[in-house]
Amino acid sequence: MIRTMLQGKLHRVKVTQADLHYEGSCAIDQDFLEAAGILEYEAIDIYNVDNGQRFSTYAIAAERGSRIISVNGAAARCACVGDKLIICSYVQMSDAAARLHHPKVAYFEGENQLQRKAKAVPVQVA
């Protein structure tokens, strides 16, 4: 059996740019990509916390240290500057590997300041 698992997650990053006429993708600060283990050109799913939009694209690297999150091309219709996003990548693996797997999660606040990194999503309490 093959399972699809969360590989990396950027939690609550803020959109800094939206460029409808760029050829596509989502530009992400290289430091952020590394924090979540996301590779340039890797497929990503984006969840807009502010408007509920969910869409797929691919990651490209933005300048290291820039704190840029730029939603480009047609996806720019799904997010505005200032919107909070959750950006995820996924990996497929065997059932046995999935049971040992831990994602790389990076949490952000304010103007895209990395607050902490984790290897799991916290258990939701009642």
Curated annotation (Swiss-Prot):
Its cofactor is pyruvate. It is found in: Cytoplasm. Is synthesized initially as an inactive proenzyme, which is activated by self-cleavage at a specific serine bond to produce a beta-subunit with a hydroxyl group at its C-terminus and an alpha-subunit with a pyruvoyl group at its N-terminus. Catalyzes the pyruvoyl-dependent decarboxylation of aspartate to produce beta-alanine. This is Aspartate 1-decarboxylase. Substrate binds at residues 57, 73-75. Its EC number is 4.1.1.11. InterPro entries: Asp_de-COase-like_dom_sf, Asp_decarbox. Heterooctamer of four alpha and four beta subunits. Binds 1 pyruvoyl group covalently per subunit. GO terms for cellular component: cytosol. Pathway: Cofactor biosynthesis; (R)-pantothenate biosynthesis; beta-alanine from L-aspartate: step 1/1. GO terms for biological process: alanine biosynthetic process; pantothenate biosynthetic process. It catalyses: L-aspartate + H(+) = beta-alanine + CO2. Its main location: cytoplasm. It comes from Yersinia pseudotuberculosis serotype O:1b (strain IP 31758). GO terms for molecular function: aspartate 1-decarboxylase activity. Keywords: Autocatalytic cleavage, Cytoplasm, Decarboxylase, Lyase, Pantothenate biosynthesis, Pyruvate, Schiff base, Zymogen. The lineage of its organism: Bacteria, Pseudomonadati, Pseudomonadota, Gammaproteobacteria, Enterobacterales. PANTHER family: ASPARTATE 1-DECARBOXYLASE (PTHR21012:SF0). The gene is panD. The modification Pyruvic acid (Ser) is found at residue 25. It holds the Pfam family Asp_decarbox. The active site is at residues 25, 58. Belongs to the PanD family. CDD domains: Asp_decarbox.
